[in-house]
Curated annotation (Swiss-Prot):
Single biological process term from Gene Ontology: rRNA processing
Name of protein: KRR1 small subunit processome component homolog
Ranges annotated as biased composition (Basic residues): 250-262
Subunit structure: Part of the small subunit (SSU) processome, composed of more than 70 proteins and the RNA chaperone small nucleolar RNA (snoRNA) U3.
Entry keywords, A to Z: Acetylation, Isopeptide bond, Nucleus, Phosphoprotein, Ribonucleoprotein, Ribosome biogenesis, RNA-binding, rRNA processing, Ubl conjugation
Family: Belongs to the KRR1 family.
Bias-annotated ranges (Basic and acidic residues): 16-31, 39-51
Modified residues (N-acetylalanine): A2
Cross-link (Glycyl lysine isopeptide (Lys-Gly) (interchain with G-Cter in SUMO2)): K342, K371
Pfam families in UniProt: KH_KRR1_1st, KH_KRR1_2nd
ATP-binding is among the record's keywords: no
Residues carrying Phosphoserine: S3
Domain of life the protein comes from: Eukaryota
């Protein structure tokens, strides 16, 4: 009996020794912990996980603008139908312009009320029902980015917001394809729906665009990251060497003034007191003159100014009678006849003599010979 008792624990311990030790978090590689396996999906929360339901009732309400009233009224039955599947009540108040969602006694998922709250927020921010209803899925999240307070100047804000959208929405479409998110720009907010990794990139791009960084730089970086993620060897390595480094150029657009004022050196002493009219007269000696003498000096100064102005005016008038300077005429020298183009005088004289002897319309000697030969040939043929 004793031997059997001793053998019992030994066999159990032997089995434990044969088993492979369980891998602890310390033994695992850090990269394996951080990477999510492909195709992994979080298990859905079912009624079996919380059979007794919730203890208290929770509710959320949000306001919506006037222009969304017609659309919400039209699609509200679909919203109620989708939320009733998760045992959430939804009410639309058109008088106050608000939407309310609240839990019931049958609600078993504690987080579904947060997703219902995000649903009505997205509907209020002009997101369509088809896209907003995706928020009720477990692997989908949303982010509403407020951009209204990031730029003070209204014109600058509109320009940067349009830069985010791009010509015919091309920039926004490229961002949606790279991040796998649906993005809606409306007013002072940017609404995004998609996976968590994509929402993080969307927020970064939107905030950088509002900080005057063009979205094309971030889109180029995202394209490179997407290609690098396909390589399994590069997943655990740093990607800094592959990503482009853009230099920010801060161009000063401030126009420099034409007249630059140079600041005077600081002195602790006050500036000297300016001279008054009496001080100036005392310095020049006019203060001691009589009134008649002062008047005479004043008249002389006026006459001198008038004479100077008259002489200037006369000079300007005389300018019209001064002829303009003519350009010097350069006479061209006759070109000397070249030796190649010299005329043969003797041959020319002979030609003139022949022309004088010749009658008008008469044939030349050569032409006469040719004619005679032609006549002889005709006679022979006959």
């Amino acid at each position: 009996m004793a031997s059997s008792k001793q053998n019992g624990p030994t066999t159990a311990s032997g089995k434990s020794e044969l088993r492979s030790p369980k891998p602890t978090s310390e033994n695992r590689d850090e990269s394996e912990l951080l990477t999510v396996p492909d195709g992994w999906k979080e298990p859905a929360f079912s009624k079996e996980d919380n059979p007794r339901g919730l203890l208290e009732e929770s509710s959320f309400a949000t306001l919506f603008p006037k222009y969304r009233e017609a659309y919400l009224k039209e699609c509200w039955p679909l919203v109620q139908k989708a939320l009733n599947e998760h045992h959430i009540n939804a009410t639309l108040d058109l008088i106050e312009g608000s939407m309310t969602v609240c839990t019931t006694k049958k609600t078993f998922d504690p987080y579904i009320i947060i997703r219902a709250r995000d649903l009505i927020k997205l509907l209020a921010r002009s997101v369509s029902f088809e896209q907003a209803i995706r928020i009720l899925q477990d692997d989908v999240a949303c982010d509403i980015i407020k951009i209204g307070s990031l730029v003070r100047n209204k014109e600058r804000f509109v320009k940067r917001r349009q830069r985010l959208i791009g010509p015919k929405g091309s920039t926004l479409k490229a961002l949606e394809l790279l991040t796998n998110c649906y993005i809606m720009v409306q007013g002072n907010t940017v609404s995004a729906i998609g996976p968590f990794s994509g929402l993080k990139e969307v927020r970064k791009v939107v905030l950088d665009t509002m900080k005057n960084i063009h979205p094309i730089y971030n889109i180029k970086t995202l394209m490179i990251k997407r290609e690098l993620a396909k390589d399994s060897e590069l997943r655990s390595q740093s990607w800094e060497r592959f990503l482009p480094q853009f230099k920010h150029k801060n161009v000063n657009k401030r126009k420099e003034p034409k007249k630059k004022t140079v600041k005077k050196e600081y002195t602790p002493f006050p500036p000297p007191q300016p001279e008054s009219q009496i001080d100036k007269e005392l310095a020049s000696g006019e203060y001691f003159l009589k009134a008649s003498q002062k008047k005479r000096q004043k008249m002389e100064a006026i006459k001198a100014k008038q004479a100077e102005a008259l002489s200037k005016r006369q000079e300007e008038r005389n300018k019209a009678f001064i002829p303009p300077k003519e350009k010097p005429v350069h006479l061209k020298k006759p070109k000397e006849a070249s030796t190649e183009t010299k005329i043969d005088v003797a041959a020319l004289k002979e030609k003139v003599k022949k022309a004088k002897n010749k009658k008008l319309g008469a044939l030349t000697a050569e032409e006469v010979k040719l004619k005679m030969e032609a006549d002889e040939k005709k006679k022979k043929k006959k």
